[in-house]
């Protein structure tokens, strides 16, 4: 996945704590074991510091996962790592909710918080 696709813009309110929530209800990837498609919803919540993520670039970043054979846990942590590295937010969480396969669903969540 190419994190260099991600673009930022300046936070107009860097002195204020506020939360941005982004939901992608059409995320797709490929199961590395079976080669079958996986479908999920990705929710990103963050408190920006100096920058915010530009949504069109995030959409193209997500599309990079479409044909990638990657486990749910790896996707969730990869997105967090890439966004934290780029944004340097005050806090950020990624929640991935995966549609049922064989009657089983999975939700993976990971959190980051700046240390002062």
Curated annotation (Swiss-Prot):
Entry's Gene Ontology molecular function annotations: preQ1 synthase activity
Entry-linked Pfam families: QueF (PF14489)
Reactions that this protein is recorded to catalyse: 7-aminomethyl-7-carbaguanine + 2 NADP(+) = 7-cyano-7-deazaguanine + 2 NADPH + 3 H(+)
Active-site residues, Swiss-Prot/TrEMBL: 31 (thioimide intermediate), 38 (proton donor)
NAD recorded as keyword: no
Entry keywords, A to Z: Cytoplasm, NADP, Oxidoreductase, Queuosine biosynthesis
Major localization listed first in the record, in broad terms: cytoplasm
Biological pathway: tRNA modification; tRNA-queuosine biosynthesis
Binding site for substrate: 53-55, 72-73
Biological processes annotated in GO: queuosine biosynthetic process; tRNA modification
Signal peptide from the UniProt entry: none
Gene3D superfamilies: 3.30.1130.10
Enzyme Commission identifier(s): 1.7.1.13
Database matches in InterPro entries: GTP-CH-I_C/QueF, NADPH_dep_7-cyano-7-deazaG_red, QueF, QueF_type1
Places the protein is found: Cytoplasm
An example Gene Ontology CC term for this record: cytoplasm
Family: Belongs to the GTP cyclohydrolase I family. QueF type 1 subfamily.
Function of the protein: Catalyzes the NADPH-dependent reduction of 7-cyano-7-deazaguanine (preQ0) to 7-aminomethyl-7-deazaguanine (preQ1).
NCBIfam families: QueF-II
The protein's name: NADPH-dependent 7-cyano-7-deazaguanine reductase
Biological source species: Pelodictyon phaeoclathratiforme (strain DSM 5477 / BU-1)
